[in-house]
Swiss-Prot record:
Adapter protein for the cul3 E3 ubiquitin-protein ligase complex. Promotes the export of zbtb16/plzf from the nucleus to the cytoplasm and targets zbtb16/plzf for ubiquitination and degradation. Up-regulates neurog1 expression and antagonizes zbtb16/plzf, to promote neurogenesis. Disruption phenotype: Morpholino knockdown of both isoform 1 and isoform 2 leads to a major decrease in the expression of neurog1 and downstream markers of neuronal differentiation. Knockdown of either isoform alone leads to a mild decrease in the expression of late markers of neurogenesis, but has no detectable effect on neurog1 expression. GO terms for biological process: neurogenesis; regulation of neurogenesis. This is BTB/POZ domain-containing protein 6-A. Transmembrane segments: none annotated. Its main location: cytoplasm. The gene is btbd6a. It is found in: Cytoplasm; Nucleus. Expressed in the developing central nervous system. SUPFAM superfamilies: POZ domain. Residues 138-208 form the BTB domain. Pfam families: BACK, BTB, PHR. It comes from Danio rerio (Zebrafish). One of its GO terms (cellular component) is cytosol.
Length: 540
């Protein structure tokens, strides 16, 4: 009885497998013999057949001319439709993913269609970064920001859990959240996106207007590397105008190094810091800590005016009319941290005595403290603040004068310097007349890459000695490390003066190292080896 078509097909399949095995057997035995000659190698007992080789072998075993021949022989040709995966385009903020599929063969010679972005981004980091803020494969969403200003952000639990122990506990811990939408009202959307971008790609993009919010987000989710980057960014952008605000934030975030850097700026540039807009935005505990500060380099009259400005702003924040009574109320004990008796009598009479924030009894007692032999007890500290002690970097080993003494002729004496630690340049020490007492008019300048940072036009009197005489800038100027700055002095007065000799290219002053080099601005002969500008006066 003839076999059914299905049986014939089955027999053909078995025959084909047997023939294939017999064809491959001699070649396999040869390989085994060759492998036995090399005992260090593992014997290979399999062969991977490529698709083209399979087709050629089948053609040799079963030569078929066309489709009609197959039909006559009774064989069934199965045509399996190729499965195609429809990939929807992804809406994405930061990157677009090309989703046109490409076909490749895997190790089993199966055709596999893959999205083109896999091959276009060969590294794991690139592919991971592509998923940032991307709906594709997202398994969680965050509603970030306060109501009315929130933003929906897609994310991937695994990526976040790997980068943050907080997210790991949130998604995979014992108290894992099952909600697909997680609300985070206390984080700004821009800061949250910066956090996520770092977690997906190791890229950090910080800006002055978002760095504090980013630091908060990094602290909240314990992403320490990003938090350190934020602190470093804040330290490099720290200035007198933002020092008080950053001090307040550093105390909130418990960042002691940043707090110390803020204090350095506030102490050295106290007047600029207290008169900045940011000072009125600080909280009361930070205000009190500033008023407790012994090292503020500022007049007490400036401190008092700054306190009044803060009280006015605080009244408005609390919805109060800024009357003297309300100002006194919001200040509380902070008012009694102002050292009113340390002002001069003239400063007190022209300022604090004419402001109603003090009671009549307080004003009367302070006037008596100034004038009476028996001092009344006061509710205010009476000792002036110590301030900072200025340091001097002297760059010459000796000074001299001869018949051809140094001459001031209205020309520019200039020198360049750099430091290895941030300092605040307060002024210059200059040589005076070698012929007795003399008065000089002087203009001093501080520049960086040709940009004027500070200048002052003033006078000083020399006594005929070889001592240096200080000339101050209006405010100390912050000087960053590892950058060259130029200081200049133009003097008019007695022509003959002392001059420095045996100049040093490097000088160690406490914990700060100064380097000096000649300046092209110098037209009066001053250089590294000799000339004028013997001293830099600074705070560190």
């Amino acid at each position: 009885m003839p076999a059914a078509p299905e049986c014939r097909l089955s027999n053909h399949g078995r025959i084909m497998k047997c023939v294939t095995f017999l064809l491959l057997l001699p070649e396999t035995l040869k390989k085994l013999k060759r492998a036995s000659k090399h005992p260090g190698r593992l014997s290979v007992c399999y062969n991977i057949l490529t698709l083209s080789l399979k087709k050629r072998m089948a053609a040799e075993l079963y030569p078929v001319s066309d489709h009609a021949t197959l039909q006559k022989s009774g064989a069934v040709m199965l045509s399996l439709p190729e499965k195609k995966r429809n990939v929807e385009p992804v809406s994405q903020t930061t990157a677009s993913i090309a989703t046109t599929p490409t076909t490749e063969q895997n190790i089993n010679n199966n055709n596999v269609e893959i999205p083109s972005w896999h091959s276009a981004h060969p590294t794991l980091r690139e592919r991971n970064a592509l998923m940032f803020n991307n709906e594709q494969m997202a398994d969680v969403h965050f509603i970030v920001g306060p109501p009315g200003e929130s933003q929906r952000v897609p994310a991937h639990k695994y990526v976040l859990a790997v980068g943050s122990s907080v997210f790991c506990a949130m998604f995979y811990g014992d108290l894992a959240e099952g909600d697909s939408d997680i609300h985070i009202p206390d984080v700004e959307p821009a800061a949250f996106l910066i956090l996520l971008k770092y977690m997906y790609s190791d890229e950090i993009e910080l800006a002055p207007d978002t760095v504090l919010a980013t630091l908060y987000a990094a602290k909240k989710y314990l992403v320490s590397a990003l938090a350190r980057a934020c602190v470093g960014f804040l330290e490099t952008s720290l200035e007198a105008r933002n020092a008080c605000v950053l001090l307040s934030q550093s105390r909130l975030f418990e960042e002691p190094e940043l707090t110390q850097r803020c204090w350095e700026v506030i102490d050295a540039q106290a007047e600029l810091a207290l008169r900045s807009e940011g000072f009125s935005e600080i909280d009361l505990p930070t205000l009190e800590s500033i008023l407790h500060r012994e090292t503020l380099n500022v007049k007490e009259s400036v401190v008092f005016q700054a306190v009044l400005g803060w009280a006015d702003a605080e009244c408005r924040r609390q919805g109060l009319s800024p009357t003297s009574q309300n100002q006194r109320s919001v200040l509380g004990k902070a008012l009694h941290l102002v050292r009113l008796p340390s002002m001069t009598l003239q400063e007190f009479a022209d300022g604090a005595a004419q402001v109603d924030i003090l009671t009549l009894e307080e004003t009367h007692s302070i006037f008596l403290w100034y004038t009476a032999a028996t001092k009344p007890s006061l509710g205010f500290p009476v000792n002036a603040r110590e301030g900072l002690t200025a340091q001097r970097c002297h760059r010459f080993q000796s000074s001299a004068y001869r018949s051809n003494q140094w001459r001031y002729r209205g020309r520019c004496d200039s020198i360049q310097f750099a430091v290895d630690k941030r300092v605040f340049i307060a002024g210059l020490g200059l040589y005076g007349s070698s012929g007795g007492k003399a008065e000089y008019s002087v203009r001093i300048e501080l520049k960086r890459q040709g940009v004027l940072l500070a200048q002052n036009l003033t006078k000083f009197v020399s006594d005929g000695s070889s001592s240096t005489f200080p000339v101050w800038f209006e405010h100390p100027v912050q000087v960053e490390q590892d950058a060259f700055y130029t200081v200049s002095a133009v003097l008019d007065g007695s022509e003959l003066s002392y001059f420095g000799q045996e100049g040093m290219t490097e000088v160690q002053c406490g914990k700060v190292t100064f380097q000096f080099q000649c300046s092209s601005d110098s037209t009066n002969g001053t250089g590294v080896q000799g000339g004028q500008i013997p001293e830099l006066i600074f705070y560190a």
